[in-house]
Amino acid sequence: MLYLTKIRNAESEFTENEQKIADFLRANVSELKSVSSRKMAKQLGISQSSIVKFAQKLGAQGFTELRMALIGEYSASREKTNATAQHLHSSITSDDSLEVIARKLNREKELALEQTCALFDYARLQKIIEVISKAPFIQITGLGGSALVGCDLSFKLMKIGYRVACEADTHVQATVSQALKKGDVQIAISYSGSKKEIVLCAEAARKQGATVIAITSLADSPLRRLAHFTLDTVSGETEWRSSSMSTRTAQNSVTDLLFVGLVQLNDVESLKMIQRSSELTQRLK
């Protein structure tokens, strides 16, 4: 019996930790080549031995055997699906009804949020919030969907008094990066962590003495290696996607948490500015 089928059939018997493992494997089956049991255990907040025991419960000798089998099953399933239906986004195909599409999209976003939140190191997050709060100037970089997340964060930070630059043009991003100073912060948003434009800006910022904070995936990447701090995001999306939907959901959960943390750090003044912003915009109606 295929392991994905075994996981589905045994779901009612899983413990809480086993259910976490099962959800992670199904949501990230396309990315398992770069996932180790150690990394997975850290992300899920469980022991490595729990992952090994889960694999053995399904009939595998260990996690490596289970991981390789799942990768093979995923590849075979994708080839079969390609022959009968057109991929529209991630696991969604042209044969799916709107009801099925809605369920798949909702579950994809739910998993992205659950797994990203499970990954947070809250002590490190608090340190990052403190670093941002003291920055004279903040630059936010990103491309495509990540740029939209960055713009949303920049608007929120400006509302509570921070000096922020978030430009869509990559040449402008690079120009701003080279002008950063010690004490300034660059928040680089890139799920892959390998986009050359974002990496170039991070290199320039670091060279100038600025602190680089990366919002990126768990995968080893040039951006992760350059960053002083990382905030990890998890998305079950595969390369078969029409837009970075669950990736953007995961990234927004991180940036929203940063914003609320900064408001909390200086709550009286922040709330005054938020109230003034609200009053001004009300006058425009």
UniProtKB/Swiss-Prot annotation:
DNA-binding region extent: 37-56
Annotated ranges, domain SIS: 128-268
Keyword terms of this UniProt record: Carbohydrate metabolism, DNA-binding, Repressor, Transcription, Transcription regulation
Transcription keyword on record: yes
GO biological-process terms attached to the record: carbohydrate derivative metabolic process; N-acetylmuramic acid catabolic process; negative regulation of DNA-templated transcription; regulation of carbohydrate catabolic process
PROSITE patterns in alphabetical order: HTH_RPIR, SIS
UniProt GO molecular function: carbohydrate derivative binding; DNA binding; DNA-binding transcription factor activity
Ranges for domain HTH rpiR-type: 1-77
Pathways involved: Amino-sugar metabolism; N-acetylmuramate degradation [regulation]
Claim: Repressor is one of the keywords in the record: yes
Complex and partners: Homotetramer.
Function per UniProt: Represses the expression of the murPQ operon involved in the uptake and degradation of N-acetylmuramic acid (MurNAc). Binds to two adjacent inverted repeats within the operator region. MurNAc 6-phosphate, the substrate of MurQ, is the specific inducer that weakens binding of MurR to the operator.
The protein, known as: HTH-type transcriptional regulator MurR
Species per Swiss-Prot/TrEMBL record: Escherichia coli O157:H7
Gene that encodes the chain: murR
